[in-house]
Amino acid sequence: MDLSELERDNTGRCRLSSPVPAVCRKEPCVLGVDEAGRGPVLGPMVYAICYCPLPRLADLEALKVADSKTLLESERERLFAKMEDTDFVGWALDVLSPNLISTSMLGRVKYNLNSLSHDTATGLIQYALDQGVNVTQVFVDTVGMPETYQARLQQSFPGIEVTVKAKADALYPVVSAASICAKVARDQAVKKWQFVEKLQDLDTDYGSGYPNDPKTKAWLKEHVEPVFGFPQFVRFSWRTAQTILEKEAEDVIWEDSASENQEGLRKITSYFLNEGSQARPRSSHRYFLERGLESATSL
């Protein structure tokens, strides 16, 4: 899998895809959706679609695709190569960088991981349609409540039969194939990650990348910078990363913080008071001050 585009810029999102097989434009196709890397504190999350003509679904099954989590890395790569060699299987994927995930989750307007996942999956299905793939059935491994997710996708694609289920990657071969594409891409992205920070003596033995992995936690503690925090390889919105920042990094006091602490929190209604102890005196306009004019309260 060629990830050179991602290696040039891994700070946002990157879409990669195979050529669309000619048969997939002519015959009705089934499409599967799955992801890899939703839980880790390190590295990107990858969403993938895989599709093939309905009459060739048995041929896809014959490749012995399975849930990527049950396969060794070498088996996943072998199966992906087999799919690449066929003339009836196509795929596409979105690589979402750790930086994109964290800034989305911590922005002024929150964009949580479920919403990001749903929108990414929807975007990939639409991408396949835009490329001319004759999609008639879609199977999706759920994120959140499957009924809600399915209703949302069905509304977006009313002419397509949509099925959303938990563990779909173990139930439907086309979703298993998508899970293999996603996992192969994520594994390669993590191995070949280009650190934009140009760090020296960087230890790349960071374990599985999952928050409960002791090796991953040790790597995070070793590579936190007291002022600037973590490299962009880290999802700084994850609780594990935030806890380490709170313990290891320097405290930051913003300009507004001091005045807020001195004044204390005020009720919002206090800003609308016209009289009383909390009312603030209003200063006159410069025009009146320069001329020694004051407001008359009585005649």
From Swiss-Prot:
Modified positions (Phosphoserine) in chain numbering: 257, 277
Molecular function (Gene Ontology), one example: RNA nuclease activity
GO terms for cellular component: cytosol; nucleoplasm; ribonuclease H2 complex
Domain RNase H type-2: 28-250
Cofactor stoichiometry and binding remark: Manganese or magnesium. Binds 1 divalent metal ion per monomer in the absence of substrate. May bind a second metal ion after substrate binding.
Record carries keyword Calcium: no
Catalytic activity: Endonucleolytic cleavage to 5'-phosphomonoester
Protein name: Ribonuclease H2 subunit A
Organism field: Homo sapiens
Lineage: Eukaryota, Metazoa, Chordata, Craniata, Vertebrata
